[in-house]
From Swiss-Prot:
InterPro entries: PG18-like. The keyword Iron-sulfur does not apply. It is found in: Cellular thylakoid lumen. Residues 76-105 form a coiled coil. This is Thylakoid protein sll1769.
Length: 105
């Protein structure tokens, strides 16, 4: 009986060691894959941000060149005056549209 108990003890211990190693390998592999995925996503995000910034810089350059060639440089006061005129036109058009809808209804 002593031999069977001792054999069961060593069998249980070996089972626990192998199971522990397998779990450790599984967790290590999972964390490794997670690290790879994280690195890939960070790189994709970095490339996306770089592309967005590049396009925005190109648009600013193109729009700036178009504005400068058509009208020349615009001061802040001129820009504000233009915005005020556009807002006034929009308000006037909204009022006319409202009157038109009221008369049609």
């Amino acid at each position: 009986m002593q031999n069977q108990v001792l054999q069961a003890f060593f069998l249980g211990r070996a089972f626990a060691e192998v199971l522990s190693e397998k779990v450790e390998d599984g967790v290590t592999n999972a964390l490794s894959e997670l690290g790879k995925f994280d690195a890939e996503q960070r790189e994709n995000l970095r490339q996306f941000i770089a592309e967005v910034q590049s396009r925005a810089a190109n648009d600013v350059t193109q729009e700036g060149a178009a504005i400068a060639t058509v009208d020349g440089p615009v001061s802040a006061d001129e820009l504000q005056e233009t915005l005020d005129k556009l807002r006034a036109e929009i308000a006037s058009l909204k009022s006319e549209l409202k009157n038109y809808r009221d008369n049609q209804g």
